[in-house]
């Protein structure tokens, strides 16, 4: 009996703690958190994120998502970006500066930056929200890649090896479905996209367009199959722009 209870408790521990946000029409179910993916090598180079920036993040969340918090809990989405620059240092300094963006604080940031040599840098703790994708900051992890185009990154073997490893590890850790690994340019179609400002609701970027993300997700799915990480179905698009 004791062993049976332990098995039940272990099974429950693998399940997602929170249901998907209400109102999403075609949300992709979470996957069970299992697999054999090891944590990739990650260099911690954290940007300044003191009490003031945390308060700014909480206030931003109140304005745009209706809840005052800076905490990122139970993320459902992983968003791929590129820096539109040629060096890790320039991107890091931009995020560290906390410069006003679109007239608001906090400044933009991402949880990770992958350099051209494949080095993975972590900038922000994974339980803190980062302002990297309008409408998704409340439920997503942001990964930047140093570069100026999707194709440039797709053809850099070292970057792609690191990017896929990191993303797959995050999928395994948080139970994120491959259909919820998206490019920034796909953000408006995510079933998790929520934005209270009508004038911001259709804002997005052109990094990681859908044709290139199809290639990325196909590679990711192949690796997930190899490493025993449930990839699930998807994507299931549910546009929030309008």
Give residue spans per PLM region:
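Solvent-exposed, acidic/flexible segments
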Residues: 71-73, 105, 136, 152-160
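Positively charged n-region of N-terminal signal peptides that target proteins for export
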Residues: 1-4
């Amino acid at each position: 009996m004791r062993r049976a209870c332990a098995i039940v408790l272990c099974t429950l521990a693998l399940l997602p703690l929170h249901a998907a946000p209400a109102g999403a029409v075609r949300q992709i179910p979470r996957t069970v958190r299992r697999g054999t993916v090891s944590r990739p090598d990650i260099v911690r180079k954290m940007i300044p994120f003191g009490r003031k920036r945390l308060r700014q993040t909480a206030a931003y969340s109140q304005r745009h998502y209706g809840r005052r918090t800076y905490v990122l809990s139970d993320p459902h989405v992983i968003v791929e970006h590129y820096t539109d620059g040629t060096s890790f240092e320039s991107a890091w300094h931009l995020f560290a500066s906390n410069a006003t963006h679109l007239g608001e604080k906090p400044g933009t940031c991402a949880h990770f930056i992958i350099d051209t040599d494949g080095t993975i840098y972590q900038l922000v703790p994974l339980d803190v929200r980062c302002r990297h994708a309008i409408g998704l900051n409340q439920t997503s992890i942001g990964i930047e890649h140093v570069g100026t185009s999707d194709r440039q990154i797709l053809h850099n073997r070292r970057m792609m090896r690191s990017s896929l490893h990191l993303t797959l590890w995050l999928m395994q850790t948080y139970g994120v479905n491959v259909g919820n690994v998206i490019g920034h340019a796909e953000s408006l179609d995510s079933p998790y996209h929520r934005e209270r400002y009508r004038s911001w609701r259709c804002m997005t970027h052109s990094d990681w367009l859908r044709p290139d993300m199809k290639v990325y997700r196909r590679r990711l799915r192949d690796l997930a199959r190899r490493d025993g990480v449930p990839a699930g179905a998807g994507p299931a698009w549910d546009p929030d722009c309008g």
